[in-house]
Amino acid sequence: MARKTPIERYRNIGISAHIDAGKTTTTERILFYTGVNHKIGEVHDGAATMDWMEQEQERGITITSAATTCFWSGMAKQFEPHHVNIIDTPGHVDFTIEVERSMRVLDGAVMVYCAVGGVQPQSETVWRQANKYKVPRIAFVNKMDRMGANFLRVVGQLKSRLGANPVPLQLAIGAEEKFTGIIDLVKMKAINWNEADQGVTFEYEEIPADMAELAAEWHQNLVESAAEASDELMDKYLGGEELTEEEIKKALRQRVLKSEIILVTCGSAFKNKGVQAMLDAVIEYLPAPTDVESINGILDDGKDTPAVRHSDDKEPFSALAFKIATDPFVGNLTFFRVYSGIVNSGDTVLNSVKSQRERLGRIVQMHANKREEIKEVHAGDIAAAIGLKDVTTGDTLCDPNNPIILERMEFPEPVISVAVEPKTKADQEKMGMALGRLAKEDPSFRVWTDEESGQTIIAGMGELHLDILVDRMRREFNVEANVGKPQVAYRETIRETVKDVEGKHAKQSGGRGQYGHVVIDMSPLPPGGVGYEFVNEIVGGSIPKEFIPAVDKGIQEQLKSGPLAGYPVVDVKVRLHYGSYHDVDSSELAFKLAGSIAFKEGFKRAKPVLLEPIMKVEVETPEDYMGDVMGDLNRRRGIIEGMEDTATGKTVRVKVPLSEMFGYATDLRSQTQGRASYSMEFLEYAEAPSNVAKAVIEARGK
């Protein structure tokens, strides 16, 4: 079957924003205007189509990035139908992993900002992730109808807070309750949407006289930005010639695709104004799969030979699984993005990361939580497969005859853990199954059993992250669980280099003995790098080469539980440079034990320290409560990084140890009568002060 829409008319876009910038409402309006949704779902009523988990509807925040397919031909029906896949991404900082995961499979993004709140903390995180994956983007300044809305202030913040190069594509006519429409700075016309049909139809009008001067100034800015796309256009512009509408659009598109500029649109999704023109901008300025760099990978040939897959149906099939979701009706749904080739339902594909074959039974295209079964998918498509058995997020699915492993996704280590136990013994098995399922869906969530206490431990990116997972266990799997006190994921490392540390394991009393002897140097590595490095510098065969991996293994086992307080050891380099062996008594086990003895000894001598996770916290508070908020943050060992005035008060940026932040949400609410809000994300590991380290080590020793 031939593809219905040529790949040049595909747009794979993400919609990304801070909480409450109105992203879900914006997505709802997109679905409405593209003809998928006949009644607009309001988040206020918990009825939005995109928020498809019960919890999201209760909390009014988006947790799962659902992928939706729709078609758009322009608000004046000026284009051929374009196939738009929308990935809805969460705006809460505990779900950064979801954002990262969806950024990986997008070609372009729409960043939604609140016209009142502007560029908020989470916006910066999302921006950094979009930079990391080189995602071209446009901005939509939403909520122009709200008190305190100011379009040009947000444009300024895009520059000052994100270091972006914003170019307004539109201006807002009026603001707050006087917001009536927008000015299209390319056409130099005002656009007025018809309220009677919820903004489906519109009229072009002349620009209001009181805005003519401002519009001319910003039109000039837009044309200048377009002219910078090429020397040829610049010469034409400087020569006083008018650039045509087509030339302006083509030039702006080139610059957006290179991420040199971010075009800024505006509107009010709630009032049905502006989303239609923003959709047109998606078509005109964001990339098709063929406009972005081809995806790189490695061949599964044992040599890791680099390979490329282009967005082309003729190339061998390759796809990336970017999300696993459990659906109450069909079981496992594996969302995947097809990078090259074609695959049909019923085909067998290879999961090249796990070297396992999987049969693609049914393929569905999702509209939030409704699904349509399709027979085949092509390069550029985003779809979900039902019933794949052993696929996890980040795995590659490909043609078994042309195996390739696409770039893997990297997932952060969890920073917080809690013990969980089922309320009834009968639920033990059910809880194990539920946690296994949830861990498969979310790579930033880990589950293990504590060997000493026998407790089940779950770990994640923040308190809210774990709350929601425990809540999902209750709702989706009917497992009620008791949750212990949150524990911080400390780490251990060393600060000094030590040389010639010996490790000897010798038992030679009659019969076959054991003998292993190693000499190592240990030194600290820079933080945030590989974490552990083992260098073999044995010359002259003082240790036979078949025993070298055993030494490494012995050390790696010690890394899991450090000598200070049993926390994982990071940022250590070990050089194995001398040792001795016995022809008969030496074995792998003996050298493994010798390696671990040397490591323990060296660690004690190398000035060991405890590292604690430091969080980047931003608090937005009305000015009246500023003193209380600052005093409280100081008590929590916070280091103030900066302060800014906002439309509603002050924003404070602070670095605070995670161990001091438990229960902060409740404390902040009571200090500010619920008027302040905060966001928190992991920043780095730093050395814990000696009094804190001492208390932690003593508590672990009990």
UniProtKB/Swiss-Prot annotation:
SMART domains: EFG_C, EFG_IV. One of its GO terms (molecular function) is GTPase activity. Keywords: Cytoplasm, Elongation factor, GTP-binding, Nucleotide-binding, Protein biosynthesis. The keyword Mitochondrion does not apply. GTP binds at residues 17-24, 88-92, 142-145. Residues 8-290 form the tr-type G domain. InterPro entries: EFG_II, EFG_III, EFG_III/V, EFG_IV, EFG_V, EFG_V-like, EFTu-like_2, G_TR_CS. One of its GO terms (biological process) is ribosome disassembly. It holds the Pfam family GTP_EFTU_D2. GO terms for cellular component: cytosol. Transmembrane segments: none annotated. It is found in: Cytoplasm. The keyword tRNA processing does not apply. SUPFAM superfamilies: EF-G C-terminal domain-like, P-loop containing nucleoside triphosphate hydrolases, Ribosomal protein S5 domain 2-like, Translation proteins. Belongs to the TRAFAC class translation factor GTPase superfamily. Classic translation factor GTPase family. EF-G/EF-2 subfamily. HAMAP family: EF_G_EF_2_B. Catalyzes the GTP-dependent ribosomal translocation step during translation elongation. During this step, the ribosome changes from the pre-translocational (PRE) to the post-translocational (POST) state as the newly formed A-site-bound peptidyl-tRNA and P-site-bound deacylated tRNA move to the P and E sites, respectively. Catalyzes the coordinated movement of the two tRNA molecules, the mRNA and conformational changes in the ribosome. This is Elongation factor G.
